Amino acid sequence: MKNRLPAALMTIVGMAFSASVAADVTPMTLRDGRIGYVMTNLFWSVYQTPDAKEECPKGFNDGPREQFEILFPDVENRTVVDTQLAQEIETWHPTTEPDPLPFYDIEGPYSYGLNLDGEVGQNDFTHPDGTQGIDNEVYRAVGCIIGFRGPDGVEVIFQDKAIADRAYNRTMIELSGVDNLENDDSVTVTVYRGMDRLLTDATGMKVMSGGSQRVDLRWGAKLIRQTEGKIVDSVLTTEPIADVVIPWMNLGVPTFQLIRDMRFQLDLSPTNANGLIAGYADVDTYYKQLIRNDSTHHLSNGQISGISLYKALSRLADAYPDPETGRNTAISTALDVKMAQVFIVHPDGEASMPQHTTD
């Protein structure tokens, strides 16, 4: 009997302590008007229905193995140079010549992404929430390739997993000048490269908020970018950044993506920032990142023909025309991104000023 009262008091004290901790979450993570987030997941936004009939009525695209059988039905009578090597050479040195084989673009009306050019064009997508004028031509190119479709597409698995696994891929953002995370009409957003492993739970599989990341000013100084944004109903929207390099190693090969006019649209909380990165991906950089990481062998597992995909990306490119040829060199895109709150550690005495800012 005599032990029940202390036990009850301990329960009440514990509940009060838990409530006070919960109430202090925001002050703990928002320090001097600053809060940082580190990227944990990243992949190209792909709108998909369960049976794919809406967006891919003609079916999925063939990969290297399937195309090889079509192109060389008489392979026994031909040389390796004329068949395997010829295809491999074109994979690594693709052209914009018309594709001799069928390639199926997305035909459905819907896509995730943002309106990048401020216009509603005839070929633009509509967001599932009804927003018109969505620009996402990368989705039009990759949406009917099984390797880019979740949850078990080979690119979905390996490209996304590499973001958390590899310190090389450590991209983070720091918001400064923040009054609160619900509504703020003016905040500064700085993109940094981090240096450290992510904080995870005991399984090592789940990334936790509350870790720390040192700013990489040796190899990452030239990757620092800065822009302005605003927070409305806990959604951060930024102004475009002229160009952003995203380190994206996959399967051990150091590579990156170059996104022009890149902007963030993120749902913010004291522990996470999830949403979209959108802009125009440089076509050649996009392709090099894919083929250098995966090669024909791995791409075949997702029925991804590098030859056909490069032709599609070049054909659908919708921005940054080459001044000499007039050919567009960048293609509109959106990426699903998840970030965990992190405490960003700046080097003592080092001025972490951005190298490039908003246009």
How should these model regions be labeled?
Residues 17-18:
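N-terminal signal peptide c-region/cleavage motif recognized by signal peptidases
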Residues 1-8:
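Bacterial N-terminal signal peptides that target proteins for export
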Residues 9, 14, 204-207:
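Residue-level detector of intrinsically disordered terminal segments
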Residues 23-359:
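Extracytosolic secretory-pathway proteins
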